[in-house]
C-alpha cells in the first residue's frame, strides 16, 4: 500500500456562528499538523494529551472531536477506517459529538426538533466528502491513490 492521502474540509454553520475543520482518512503521519490545529483553537492539557495519544497511535477506526465552546470552533478527525461500515460508525460518532457540543453551548433541548435539524445540517455539510468513503472502490482510491 502507498502513502495515505488525508482530506481536509472546512465548513461553517451560520445559524450558530460555528466553524468546523474536518480531517478525513487520517493516519499518524498527520499528527503534528492536527495537533497544531487543535492547539490553535485552544485545546490544552489533558485534552491535548489524549488527542496526541489517539493520533500518534496509528490505529484504524478511530477519531476525535474537540470544540472550543467560547470561540465556536471545532476540529474533527475521522481516521482511516478498515471498511465503509467502520467509516459510517466513526462519521456518525464524531458528528454526534459536534452536535452535542453545539447543543450544550446554546442550551438546546437534546430531544427537540432544533437538535434534529442541526444533526441533518451537519450531515449535509459533510456529505460531499463523506459519501466517497461509503463506496469500497472510492475509499481505496481516496485513501491510497489507486483504483
Task: Report the location of each language-model feature.
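Non-catalytic terminal regions of proteins
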Residues: 4-59
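Short helix/strand-bridging catalytic loops that position acidic/His residues to coordinate divalent metals
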Residues: 101-107
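Active-site recognition of the HExxH zinc-binding catalytic motif
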Residues: 89-101
